[in-house]
Structure formats: structure tokens, C-alpha cells
Amino acid sequence: MHYCVLSAFLLLHLVTAALSLSTCSTLDMDQFMRKRIEAIRGQILSKLKLTSPPEDYPEPEEVPPEVISIYNSTRDLLQEKASRRAAACERERSDEEYYAKEVYKIDMPPFFPSENAIPPTFYRPYFRIVRFDVSAMEKNASNLVKAEFRVFRLQNPKARVPEQRIELYQILKSKDLTSPTQRYIDSKVVKTRAEGEWLSFDVTDAVHEWLHHKDRNLGFKISLHCPCCTFVPSNNYIIPNKSEELEARFAGIDGTSTYTSGDQKTIKSTRKKNSGKTPHLLLMLLPSYRLESQQSNRRKKRALDAAYCFRNVQDNCCLRPLYIDFKRDLGWKWIHEPKGYNANFCAGACPYLWSSDTQHSRVLSLYNTINPEASASPCCVSQDLEPLTILYYIGKTPKIEQLSNMIVKSCKCS
């Protein structure tokens, strides 16, 4: 009898303690939004290492085309990556560097310097060579965070095969006849006759090596998965063994006549259409003054729990839409592009069932006693986040930065 009374008393005590442990504050949606907007204001300034917004200057009548080109390339690259992750059910890394990264674009030197230029007399049917001059960035070698090689695949109606697997290699400086002449980077399957598309490759390691060792910058090689031929980089010579030719065509690399049929007017029009699609590198660097702060305040990786999809109509934890208009919501005119973005936020209850027949609730009760201000119950927090690219002005100087973890894509109870 005494045992039953004691058990009932203990159970009542544990339930009461468990209820008292839910210390996550509950706010109405308007208050959530206001707090989220203010958090974004501080987040952007913090990532840019600014204590206050830049002084307002008259907006330029026209942004230089090369600046717009870098911004568009960076924005498109992030959108492509997000689409690929969504298709593959992958998540954005949440342990990226906190501070904003400066973005630089390095175009490949043109093969055809003028409209009337004659293509090279030699034709490489099995591969393409692409080179970049990164010497201007050597002083910032240690600040490199990411490097992407982007090349635009053109539609080739003349292609004899509809699909090919192309591979990207870093050309190596061979020390002797037995040493390797190339290093594999990545591969992609492309449809040669389909509409054109941008192809992106992560070349961080290769560019990092070039920045530290200028003599090793011999460029990239684009070839087929199994060309079955020997490549000699010293004289750009190959020994073919009935190799399959590379049917994919690339803007800025292949002459217009190799993939376009028609008169000179058609060829000229096609060349003009593809003039802004030159192969290029996108380098993302952390400025020195931010690099020092990053190294001294390195954030720890967060464990990613299982993701669950919630509808916004629910009261439980889920992703809530929130569009931030920089001018309207923050009173800022200094960010030129974009005008705003979908920041989103996480809100809602996180139901948690305590088990009275285990020691878990007792431990949590003790934890709450020792840490009365802490939350022992799960709270609704962001899980997957994506970066944001902005174009802004400091005085009359345009700057392009990539801000990590700015767009909330999913939530979790943690």
C-alpha cells in the first residue's frame, strides 16, 4: 500500500517537473517577425564587419557591366547549387565561415580577340585546354575560401552522339616520363544537342596550388570519360587510338562554325549572343581583417538531426515565410542588389513526451534546478540555411559579397 502511494507521489512529482521544464518562450507571429528583421539587420552588419550602415551616397546612374557580371554569375551559381541539393535531398553545410566573402571573377583570355578573327589552324577533337591568369590574386592566396570554374555548354545540333560524359582535369607539370600529366577533378554527363547550360566545377584545390606556386598553373583540360588517347602537355599533342571525339561545344572556346550552320550573318548573330558567356573563375576570399576574427572565434559544427516537413498552417514547429525588403524593413538604400530576399524564420511548438519510467526526466529535473534560466525542452530552430549574394557601395566603390547562412530553408526541434 505504501509502495503504491509512494509511486503515485513520485509520478505526480515527475510530471509536474517535466511541465515546468518547457522554458522556450512563445511569441506571436508579429513579434517573431520583428525580432527576425532586427536579427537580420545585425547579422548583415556583423558579417561585413560594419558597426553601422555605410553613409548614404547618390546611387550610380549605371553599374559597371563587369560588376553586374560578377554579381549575376555568383547569384546564378548559388541558385544552381541549391537546385541540385534539393533534387538530391542534400543539405547546405551550416559550418561555413561566418563573415562575408569577397567575390572576384577572372575571365579566360579570349581565343578569338575580334569578330573577324580566324580560328586557330589546329583543331583538338578530343579535348579542350582552358587557362587563367590568377597572378593578381597571389597576395591573397591564404584568404581563398572557394574557387569555381564555370563554362557554358552550347547546343550542338551537329553532334553525332546525344550524350557524353565530360571530365575536368588539372594539367600537371611533369617531372619525368613516368610522372602523371593530369589530375582528375570532376565529371558531368551532358546532352550535346540540348539547350545550352552553365557547368560548374569546384577547383579550390587547383587554384590554391596556383596561387602558391605560379609555375604549376598550366590550366585545365576538358575531355571525355575515356578518350583512350595519350595526352602530352609539353606540346599539346595527343596519340589517338580511335578515340570518341568531344561533341560538346563551349562558349568562348570553340569557334562558332564548329556548332552553327548558316551564313556569315547567322554566325555573327550567334557569336554576339554568346559573347557574355566566357569561361571564368569565381574566387571567394575572406578579407584579412575578417580572417583574423574567424580564426579566433571559430564556430563549432552543429549536428544535423532528422528533418521533418511541416506545413505553415500548423501551430507546431515549421518554416514561416518572411520577405525582407532592405529599403522598407531596414531603411537601407546602400544595398544595390538584390532589393530584398526571402529570409524566412522558424516558429512553433515542439511537443515533447517525457518518459516517467526512465531516469531521463529525473536528470532533466535536476538540470532545470541547476540551470533555471536554460531551456531543457526542445525549441524550434533553423536547420538548413543558404547563402545570399549582395552588391553594395562603400562611397563610390562597388563591392560584391557572399553572406553565409542568410536564407532559412527548413526547421527542426532541438
Curated annotation (Swiss-Prot):
Gene Ontology biological process: cardiac epithelial to mesenchymal transition; cardiac muscle cell proliferation; cardioblast differentiation; cell migration; cell morphogenesis; cell-cell junction organization; collagen fibril organization; embryonic digestive tract development
UniProt cross-references to InterPro entries, sorted A to Z: Cystine-knot_cytokine, TGF-b_C, TGF-b_propeptide, TGF-beta, TGF-beta-rel, TGFb2, TGFb_CS
Residues bearing glycans: N72, N140, N241
Signal peptide: 1-20
CDD domains: TGF_beta_TGFB2 (cd19385)
Keyword set, alphabetical order: Cleavage on pair of basic residues, Disulfide bond, Extracellular matrix, Glycoprotein, Growth factor, Mitogen, Secreted, Signal
CC annotations in GO: extracellular matrix; extracellular region; extracellular space
Disulphide connectivity of cysteines: C309-C318, C317-C380, C346-C411, C350-C413
Example of a GO MF term: protein homodimerization activity
Subunit structure, interactors included: Interacts with the serine proteases, HTRA1 and HTRA3. Interacts with ASPN. Interacts with MFAP5.
PANTHER family named among the record's database cross-references: TGF-BETA FAMILY, TRANSFORMING GROWTH FACTOR BETA-2 PROPROTEIN
Family under the similarity heading: Belongs to the TGF-beta family.
Name of the protein this chain belongs to: Transforming growth factor beta-2 proprotein
Organism: Mustela putorius furo
